[in-house]
Each structure stands twice: as structure tokens, then as C-alpha cells.
Amino acid sequence: MASLRKTHPLLKIVNDNSIDLPTPQNISAWWNFGSLLGLCLVAQILTGLFLAMHYTPDINAAFSSVAHICRDVNHGWLIRNLHANGASFFFLCLYLHIGRGLYYGSYLNKGTWNTGILLLLLIMVTAFVGYVLPWGQMSFWGATVITSLLSALPYVGTDLVQWLWGGFSVDNATLTRFFAFHFFIPFIATAVVALHFLFLHETGSNNPTGLSSSADKVPLHPYFLYKDLLGFLLLLAPLTALAVFSPNLFGDPDNFLRANPMVTPTHIKPEWYFLFAYAILRAIPNKLGGVLALLASILVLAVVPFLHTSKQRSLALRPWSQLCLFTLVVTVLILTWIGGMPLEQPLTTVGQIASLLYFTIILFLMPMLGLIENKMLN
């Protein structure tokens, strides 16, 4: 008699997408980040749900309610620290997942890649509106500066900003709607994750060689499920250690002050995971140009599949392209550093050069090197 997991209508879906899923034998630890992102999403939704039970989305009470959660709610400090630092780990896994996709040519699964970009945008929006909720100084001014960038759009910009704010400045209406967005968008992201899965399982996973592995696959369970469990351990251990021993490592000291519209912080900056995009925004002196560059820094990923010129899918045997991609990684790290620094020389020039290099590598150098490597193969 067939097993229940193979015959039950619901369990069969779970079985086909996890337990008996045909998986390439040679996938490395770089393929662990998908499951780690799933873990991060579940952890963020659960901790966020408990925080929402005690949080008050009102400008007069938001700051105090966060302090109340940390001081008076049973294990509230731990839930809050896990949620705040969980976002950092979430983005770290996201960027490594994207980097793996770029290195091994996973972007050629266009459906999977495009739903992944949509997920990235949704999670970025969620993180941004979530950063505003504690109503600290950097929360308030970060929200004011970033949302006011929409005013750069011709004709509709000012109306759009006022519509988003719910008034003429970041105020109570803004905080209330940002809380609603922060609560709701992760559930939309969960639905998009299902789409991401759907597209991925339509084509099957890529592997380090970039070659078809249809003739050489094994079930996901037990081999890779145990490997994923080890990944969970290796993620949860440093996250818990950070939340317990150094919870404010990635936070901003200004957020220990209640939001004050009358006092501007000396240096306004977002969380570390947005700094590379913030540096690209600041590299353009023109406001509208900066906004377009900010959008392009993320949306440029959508054109990567169309710029693939190499006969080989993976970079595993393409040393020149490897060097180019590692240069891109270093460029992103430089942009992250520049984004967190004050806007002054020579840092401004370094940021502009790094921004130019970022787009040049993705749009020109990688496709050119693919063509050159094709010629070398001939």
C-alpha cells in the first residue's frame, strides 16, 4: 500500500515539493540560503506577531510601547532583539543568495529570478517601513528623507508624498499606515515565495557546473534536509548570540532618542543593508537622477538574464568573469562603507566612481567578458 504522504491530496503537495523532490547531487552549501531565507521569513513573522500584540502605532505612545515591550513584557527584550537583528541576517542571506545566483547562472531560470527580484523589493519595503515604527530620531528622519525623494517625480511628486504621509509631514497618519504595511506585506511576500517555488520546481534546481543534472538526482530527504538543518543551526546560533550579547551592534544610537521634528541628526543614514543603494542615490547630484539611480541599483538585476552572452552557464570555469564578479562584490562593500559616511570629499568622489563601476560591471564588462571567453574556447 502506498504511503499516506504520497496519496493524501495535501500531503502529496508537501511530499513532491520537499521530501521526494529530485535534487542535483552536487549542490554545495551555497544552495542552503534558500531554506535559510524561509527560516528567516517565518522567524520574522512570528516575532513580529508577538511584538504587534504590545506595540502602539501612535506617535505619542510608539517609543514608550517599544520600551514597555523590552522592560515589562515577558521575554519582550529577546523577541524585540531577535526581530531587529533577524532583519540583518535576513538581508545577509538575501544578498548571498543573489550572489550565488549571479555566480552559478541561476538567473537563466527567468521566472524564478524575476519572482526573486519582486521578493527582494517587497522585503526592502517591509524593512524600511519597519525601521520607522520605534519612532526614534533616526527612524523619523530616515522616513522623512527617503519618502520625500518621491517629490522629485515631475507633476505628481508633491501630491504623491503628501498622499503617502497622510498630511504635510511625517506624522501620526504616516506611522499608522507604515505599521499596517509592515504587518501586511510579509504575508504578500509569503505568497510570492510560493510562486518562486512554483517556477523553481518547474525547471528544477541549477547546480555548480551549470549543466543539466536530470540523469543524476537524489530525493531531497534525507540528504539535503539534514544539510538544511545544519544550516539552520549555523544561522540561529550567531543570531541568538547577537540578540543576547550585543543587540544594538547594527542599530543607530540616535534611535535611543524619541523622534523630534525640531532637531535634525548630524548624519542621516538607513540600516546597513540599504547603505549601498543609499550611496548610489547620493552619488548623483540631481535629485531625480538620484532616485532613478536608486531604483536602477536593484532593478538592474532584472536585465542580467538578457545580458548573458557566454556559452557556459556557471562562472566555475570562467576565471576572467569570476574576477569581474568579485570586483562587483568589493564595489558593493565599498558602496556600503561610503553610504554610512558623511557626504564630504574625497568620499563623495569614491562613491561616484564605485557607483559607476557597479553599473559598468553588470551592464558592460560581464557580457563583454562572456563574448571574449567564447572566442578563447574556439
Swiss-Prot record:
Gene3D superfamilies: Cytochrome Bc1 Complex, Chain C. The gene is mt-cyb. It is a multi-pass membrane protein. Keywords: Electron transport, Heme, Iron, Membrane, Metal-binding, Mitochondrion, Mitochondrion inner membrane, Respiratory chain, Transmembrane, Transmembrane helix, Transport, Ubiquinone. The keyword tRNA-binding does not apply. It comes from the Eukaryota. This is Cytochrome b. Its cofactor is heme b. It comes from Indostomus paradoxus. InterPro entries: Cyt_b/b6_C, Cyt_b/b6_C_sf, Cyt_b/b6_N, Cytb/b6-like_sf, Cytochrome_b, Cytochrome_b_C_euk/bac, Cytochrome_b_N_euk/bac, Di-haem_cyt_TM. One of its GO terms (molecular function) is metal ion binding. It holds the Pfam family Cytochrome_B. It is found in: Mitochondrion inner membrane. The chain crosses the membrane at residues 33-53, 77-98, 113-133, 178-198, 226-246, 288-308, 320-340, 347-367. Heme 1 (or BL or b562) is low-potential and absorbs at about 562 nm, and heme 2 (or BH or b566) is high-potential and absorbs at about 566 nm. Component of the ubiquinol-cytochrome c reductase complex (complex III or cytochrome b-c1 complex) that is part of the mitochondrial respiratory chain. The b-c1 complex mediates electron transfer from ubiquinol to cytochrome c. Contributes to the generation of a proton gradient across the mitochondrial membrane that is then used for ATP synthesis.
